[in-house]
Swiss-Prot record:
Keyword entries, A-Z: DNA-binding, Metal-binding, Neurogenesis, Nucleus, Repeat, Repressor, Transcription, Transcription regulation, Zinc, Zinc-finger
Purpose of the protein: Transcriptional repressor. Plays a role in oligodendrocyte differentiation, together with OLIG2. Mediates Notch signaling-activated formation of oligodendrocyte precursors. Promotes differentiation of adult neural stem progenitor cells (NSPCs) into mature oligodendrocytes and contributes to remyelination following nerve injury.
The name this protein goes by in its record: Zinc finger protein 488
Gene Ontology MF term list: DNA binding; zinc ion binding
Region of interest (Disordered), ranges: 77-180
Compositional bias segments (type: Basic and acidic residues): 106-125
GO cellular component: nucleus
Source organism of this protein record: Homo sapiens
Motif (Nuclear localization signal): 298-305
Length: 340
């Protein structure tokens, strides 16, 4: 009798007793099958029953049913996945250990789903999720696998890029301070519809009113006397529209220009009075517009000048040395260089 591994020591005796119990002696073909399966049993403890297709002799047909039943029971007893009672578990092969790493993934997914369900139960009844908190029992896979962190579904949708600025809440917004006095009604603002706030006017370029045209910014006569402006553009950090009092022209005014506040730099450079007509008190954006206005409106006044004013002009533009008269002052200054 050959020596069997410890995990299959009882298997040959079972097959022999079952075959003897049914009255069929052990045939030489059965012995050949046991001998052929010995090297396979010694390698990985997995019995392989090899049957010969070309059976010779009448003993192959005798006890065939008994041998089939015995081999089936032997396969059930020595199955690698089911442990036998009273015997140690057989060592797992490399293929089974590698397969166990993939079988853990469904369990980890189930844990993650359960943790998400628990986080949803702890949310507020209004439907707003609470602060995202990491669970203490983080599911970990076997060696070499990644670590999965469980976050609530609401926090996952609220995650944003690290480079984007956080949105300010309405409570954190500074209190709006009105530019105009509190006692003045909004109807007295004329064409400037709406109430202007200092927080909405961070700079001059952001001042945009649908009724305030670009051309109207240059059609300004003068700034009101009771509108002190802060020198923001000269170095002060505060807004230039803070603590200002706007003076709105009366509705009966014949001027069609829009009244607005200009920063101090524009008034200091003289942009509001650069193309200004002294006769009709109008300002123009372009110099060509002022020239066209002077030729069309004030041309008749210069047609018939006063003789007394013309005489005084000639006396003022006369050379004190040779008493020569000139029409222009620069002609007189050029003439005076010849006497030096």
């Amino acid at each position: 009798m050959p020596e069997w591994p410890p995990c299959l020591s009882v298997a040959p005796a079972l097959v022999i007793t079952m075959a003897a119990g049914k009255g069929a002696p052990l045939s030489p073909s059965a012995e050949n099958r046991w001998r052929l399966s010995e090297p396979e049993l010694g390698r990985g403890c997995k019995p392989v029953l090899l049957e010969k297709t070309n059976r010779l002799g009448p003993e192959a047909a005798v006890g065939r049913a008994g041998r089939d039943v015995g081999s089936a029971e032997l396969a059930l007893l020595v199955a690698p996945g089911k442990p036998r009672p009273g015997k140690p578990l057989p060592p797992k092969t490399r293929g089974e250990q590698r397969q166990s790493a993939f079988t853990e993934l469904p369990r980890m997914k189930d844990r993650q789903v359960d943790a998400q369900a628990q986080e949803r139960e702890h949310d507020d009844p209004t439907g707003q999720p609470g602060a995202p908190q990491l669970t203490q029992n983080i599911p970990r896979g076997p060696a070499g696998s990644k670590v999965f962190s469980v976050w609530p579904s609401g926090a996952r949708s609220e995650q944003r890029s690290a480079f984007s600025k956080p949105t300010k809440r309405p409570a954190e917004r500074p209190e709006l301070t009105s530019v105009f006095p509190a006692g003045e009604s909004a109807d007295a603002l004329g064409e400037l519809s709406g109430l202007l706030n200092t927080t909405d006017l961070a700079c001059w370029g952001r001042l945009s009113t649908p009724k305030l045209l670009v051309g109207d910014l240059w059609n300004l006569q003068a700034l009101p006397q009771n509108a002190p402006l802060c020198s923001t553009f000269l170095g002060a950090p505060t807004l230039w529209l803070e603590h200002t009092q706007a003076q709105v022209p009366p509705p009966s005014s014949s001027s069609t220009t829009s009244w607005a506040l200009l920063p101090p730099t524009l008034t200091s450079l003289g942009l509001s009075t650069q193309n200004w007509c002294a006769k009709c008190n109008l300002s123009f954006r372009l110099t060509s517009d002022l020239v066209f206005h002077m030729r069309s409106h004030h041309k008749k006044e210069h047609a018939g000048p006063d003789p007394h004013s013309q005489k005084r002009r000639e006396e003022a533009l006369a050379c004190p040395v040779c008493q020569e008269h000139f029409r222009e002052r620069h002609h007189l200054s050029r003439h005076m260089t010849s006497h030096s």
